[in-house]
From Swiss-Prot:
The keyword Cytoplasm does not apply. It comes from Leishmania infantum. HAMAP family: Ribosomal_L12_arch. The keyword Ribosomal protein applies. One of its GO terms (cellular component) is cytosolic large ribosomal subunit. The gene is LIP. Residues 79-106 are annotated as: Disordered. Belongs to the eukaryotic ribosomal protein P1/P2 family. It holds the Pfam family Ribosomal_60s. This is Large ribosomal subunit protein P2. It comes from the Eukaryota. One of its GO terms (molecular function) is structural constituent of ribosome. Phosphorylated. Plays an important role in the elongation step of protein synthesis.
Amino acid sequence: MQYLAAYALVALSGKTPSKADVQAVLKAAGVAVDASRVDAVFQEVEGKSFDALVAEGRTKLVGSGSAAPAGAVSTAGAGAGAVAEAKKEEPEEEEADDDMGFGLFD
C-alpha cells in the first residue's frame, strides 16, 4: 500500500511517476525500499492512467463499502442491551471520583 501511495503522490504532483521518483518518496517517508515491490507496482499500473486507476479503485470501494454499514447496523442492534447496562454503571463511578478529597469549591 505504501508503494501505491507513493506512486499516487508523484502522480498528483503533476509528474509522470518513475521508479526513481517513487523510491525517493518512500525514502523520504522513512520506508526501507524494496526494488522488487516498486517493480511490481509499475507492472500492475503499466498502460493505465492515474485517473483510470482511481476510477477502478472507487468501484472496488463502493462494492466493499456498501456491505460495512449493513453489518454495523445488525451488530449494533444485537448489543444495545449491553450498551445500556454499561451506561447505567458509569455514573456511579464518576460520582465517587468527582471530589477526590480536595473540596476546593465547597
